């Protein structure tokens, strides 16, 4: 799903989208859909969910494009933020139950950083697909997007302790898979 970059400037793309020009909206979509699809796949359990997240996200982009402020961020960064929030909303809808698990700092396992560094991003994302939805979302938000546990808790409507627990579970899962791979 790779498309050539648009010949229009970023400003012209934004202006066209604000004017609801379908041709320009299609150009914006084609320019960014591949990289944003990768982002959606990192949150989705399957391809269909990722496509739904992407489509919902682009709908929000086009509906909110007039609120984009070029002096604050690039259009890609702004759209990426919308996609992340759309993915979280999607996960929330699918995971209506609000589980709260309290986790104390002293129970945080020592993470074998070297083991995780040996894995490619693609290997990690493939392995993450087997994790529960919330655990995968916490891992992505913390490791990939750089959110802290307080921010993750607010986004996912879970406690900071629950966020820490999900991150710990994701890391333990990845390390165990890596150890099993080394033994094979």
Q: Each PLM stretch: what is its role?
A:
Residues 29-47, 64, 80, 128, ...:
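Amphipathic, Lys/Arg- and hydrophobic-enriched alpha-helical face
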Residues 6-7, 96-121:
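Internal acidic/polar
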Residues 138-142:
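A short pre-motif secondary-structure segment
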Residues 1-7, 16, 126, 154-157, ...:
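C-terminal edge and immediately downstream basic/flexible tail or linker adjoining helix-turn-helix-like DNA-binding
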Residues 18-19, 45, 56-72, 93-94:
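Sigma70-family region 2
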Residues 14-38:
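A short, charge-rich alpha-helical start-of-domain segment used by transcription regulators
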Residues 67, 81-101:
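Arg/Lys-rich amphipathic alpha helix in sigma70-family domain 2
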Residues 52-59, 73-85:
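Structural recognition of an alpha-helix C-terminal capping motif at a helix-to-coil junction
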